[in-house]
A protein has these predicted regions:
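N-terminal helix-turn-helix DNA-binding core of bacterial DNA-binding proteins
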Residues: 38-81, 165
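Charged, amphipathic alpha-helical coiled-coil/dimerization segments
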Residues: 2-4, 8-12, 90-148
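C-terminal regulatory/oligomerization modules of transcriptional regulators
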Residues: 1-20, 143-166
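Short, hydrophobic-biased segments on the C-terminal half of alpha helices
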Residues: 71, 89-90
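Alpha-helical linker/hinge and terminal dimerization helices associated
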Residues: 36, 40, 78, 121-140, ...
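N-terminal leader segment of winged-helix/HTH proteins
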Residues: 1-48
Length: 166
């Protein structure tokens, strides 16, 4: 008599051990991220477009109510360290794309506020950014594979955390 099939064991779910699949996936994720970001940044830089980090900050502000976020809230959505985000916001402020304002509810905090010229810079960069993503990343996957990959990568983030689109 055949044993009933058991559920597949999740990597490290009970023992803390890292399975071969999880180890391989983690390494591939890190290498792929570095590979694609470097190639896309190079293309964008050659075309005089915003960096992916600058674009993402401007995008998060464009989605925010009244186009403003506290610096702490912006940090939670950014892919930079706190000091890296502060330096980036400094640069965006010098360009006139973002301004800092004292938070009306907490005078100890600052909000980053998207300016009209910041939104225009983001909008100008999007076609170049989309083209670079398509050329450097998108052509590796058909539409179904891209959705599957997105679903898998979004799973650890939990529902709602991945809703902001590039």
């Amino acid at each position: 008599m055949k044993k009933p099939a058991s559920e597949p064991k999740k990597c490290g779910a009970t023992t803390g051990d890292l399975g071969e699949g999880a180890h391989r996936a983690w390494g591939a994720l890190l290498r792929s991220h570095a590979h694609f970001v470097e190639r896309i940044e190079r293309k964008l830089s050659a075309q005089g477009a915003l960096s992916p980090e600058a674009y993402d900050v401007l995008l998060m502000l464009s989605y925010a109510p009244n186009h403003r976020l506290r610096m702490g809230e912006l940090y939670e959505t950014a892919t930079l360290s706190r000091s890296g985000l502060t330096r980036l916001v400094d640069r965006l402020e010098k360009e006139g794309w973002v301004k800092r304002e004292v938070c009306p509810n907490d005078r100890r905090s600052f909000e980053a506020v998207l300016t009209a010229s910041g939104e225009a810079a983001r909008a100008r960069s999007w076609p170049l950014y989309a083209q670079a993503i398509a050329r450097e990343f998108g052509h590796f996957f058909d539409e179904k594979e891209a959705h599957t990959l997105a679903d898998l990568l979004e799973r650890p983030l939990g529902k709602g955390e991945s809703e902001a689109q590039v």
